[in-house]
Amino acid sequence: QEQFQLFLFDADYWWERIVVPGGLADYIAEYLTQFYYHVWAGACILAFLYVLLQRLVWKLAKEQGAADVYYPLSFLPIIVLWHFMGDENAMLSLVVALLLALSASCWYADLKGKWQRVAYILIVLPLLYWTAGAAHFIFMGWVIVREFRLNLKGKNFWGGVGVFWGVGLWGIGCPLLASMWVQFPIYRLMGGIGYYRFPAVIPWIE
């Protein structure tokens, strides 16, 4: 992919990327993609990112009480992603965005206070959308599942329903609000701008 881009170390290039949702993930990914010129370096970068993703997946699984016997299952999302990234039009931005989303989920899991978690969601969800793009839906889904389970344990079903609607509407509202400032169709704001080179023809993972 490095032959299709020209990474520039100047402020204009930075602002060109950062003013769109997912721009930070795009910027980091494009910086790393430069090193694909050396095949061994590109392979090492991808391997390192995949290992980080797997560790984050397992950390979140352990937070939900997963037994060690399920450790091999933590590789399944990475294998699926590895397969998808075999497409030359799949961009490294997706991997970086997933790392940002899973990192945000891990930091959320470390919060203890109720109001700390509420403030974190209100601030981080839109911030994550702007930096990582539509991968913020992963963080949104994680929060909903985790809080719903906590409310069910406390026999507070309707509290879980409230979290579902509140967090869900806030997460969906982020790309809708972004559409007021950036000139992209809704389907691209909802699906990620820089994850695939030709977004109108994203293939099925087969």
What are the functions of these language-model segments?
Residues 1, 70-80, 119-126, 162-173:
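Alpha-helical transmembrane segments
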Residues 2-32, 81-82, 86-88, 174-205:
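Membrane-interfacial interhelical loops
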Residues 18, 22, 46, 69-116, ...:
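Membrane-interface micro-motifs in multi-pass membrane enzymes
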Residues 34-35, 129:
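Solenoid-like repeat scaffolds
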Residues 36-51:
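Loop-to-helix entry region of an early transmembrane alpha helix in multi-pass inner-membrane enzymes
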Residues 47-64, 102-107:
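Transmembrane-helix motifs of polytopic, lipid-linked glycan transferases
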Residues 58-69, 110-116, 147-161:
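Membrane-interface helix-boundary motifs at transmembrane edges
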Residues 89-92, 110-149, 169-182:
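Transmembrane helices and adjacent periplasmic/lumenal helix-loop junctions
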